[in-house]
Design a protein with these regions (language model features):
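Periplasmic/extracellular electron-transfer cofactor-ligation site
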Residues: 35-61, 84-88, 110-114
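Helix-centric, low-specificity signal for extended rod-like, repetitive segments
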Residues: 3, 32-34, 79, 102
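Generic hydrophobic secondary-structure packing signal
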Residues: 26, 30, 46, 78-81
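Extracytoplasmic electron-transfer domains, predominantly the class I c-type cytochrome c fold
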Residues: 59-111
Length: 114
C-alpha cells in the first residue's frame, strides 16, 4: 500500500471511532435526561427502583416496571401510557416534550437491567 492509502485507512478508522463515541455520548445524554425526568415526575409513585412500592404507589396501585407483564409491553405502549395516562396515572402529553418522553421510557427500561 502507498502512504496515501495508509493515511486514508487511518483517517477512516478515526472517523469511525469518533462516530461511535458521538453515538455513545448521545445515548448517555438521553439516559441522563431520562433519569432527571423520572426523578422529577415518577419516583413519588413508582419509587427509585420502579417497583411501585412507595406509599403513594401502593395506594394508587402503581405498576412495577420490572414485572414480567410490564416488561413484555413495547416502548410504544409505554409511550402511550405516559402520553395519555392510565388508571390513576396522569397524562404527561402537555407536561413533557416528545424527547423527554422517549428519554424517560428508555430510562425506565434500564431500571430493570440494574
Amino acid at each position: 500500500m502507498t502512504r496515501t492509502a495508509h493515511w486514508l485507512w487511518r483517517l477512516a478508522l478515526c472517523a469511525a471511532v469518533l462516530a461511535a463515541a458521538c453515538l455513545l455520548s448521545a445515548s448517555a445524554r438521553g439516559q441522563d435526561a431520562g433519569e432527571k425526568v423520572y426523578k422529577a415526575k415518577c419516583t413519588t409513585c413508582h419509587g427509585a427502583d420502579g417497583a411501585g412500592a412507595t406509599p403513594v404507589g401502593k395506594a394508587t396501585k402503581a405498576r412495577d416496571f420490572c414485572s414480567e407483564e410490564v416488561k413484555k409491553e413495547s416502548d410504544e405502549e409505554w409511550t402511550q401510557i405516559v402520553v395519555k395516562g392510565k388508571n390513576k396515572m396522569p397524562a404527561y402529553d402537555k407536561k413533557l416534550t416528545e424527547a423527554e418522553i422517549k428519554d424517560v421510557v428508555a430510562y425506565i427500561r434500564g431500571l430493570c437491567k440494574k
